[in-house]
Amino acid sequence: MCRPLQLLFLMVLPLAGIAQEAQISDAKYIDDALSAAPAAIAKDAAVVRIGNDGAMRTLRKGTNGFTCLIMGTDKMCNDKNSMAFVHALMNHEPPPNKVGISYMLAGDKGASNSDPYATGKTADNHWIVTGPHLMVFGPPSKTLGYTKAKDPDPNKPYMMWAGTPYEHAMIPVGPAR
């Protein structure tokens, strides 16, 4: 079992209001989760599914170090280092000093760009919805020179959660929804 994924899912599940275990078949879940990554990554990625009880099931073993999953309705595919970043975020710990890549080629439903722990849109939390994108985690991402604006154009690269320990690069690869 991969504890970081469990923690991440357990934080997101109540927000999503979705009982994933009963929602879709494993075959459909695998197809949907893999849609987060480019075909070359998806073909060898692991797929995990977290049940209503928080237990993680590996639906498909991988060979390339990427793990794909669905959190709420957001599909993502993470390398090992991005999972370490997510683990740190969920545990309110300092993020690792490693570069990590996460694909979200299906886009997202939105997040606060000022508060990593916000659970929904408010008048002052700079909610942003980004279309298909990838994320780059770790200190080197801060050297890319992307805007750190709280309300950036989601069609251009920007730094999410700028000024927090969890700052990372958001790199759109398609139009925002």
Residue locations for each model-derived region?
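Primary mode marks residue(s) on the alpha4-beta5-alpha5 output face of response regulator receiver
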Residues: 21-177
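Sec-dependent signal peptide recognition
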Residues: 2-10
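Hydrophobic h-region of N-terminal signal peptides that target proteins for export
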Residues: 11-19
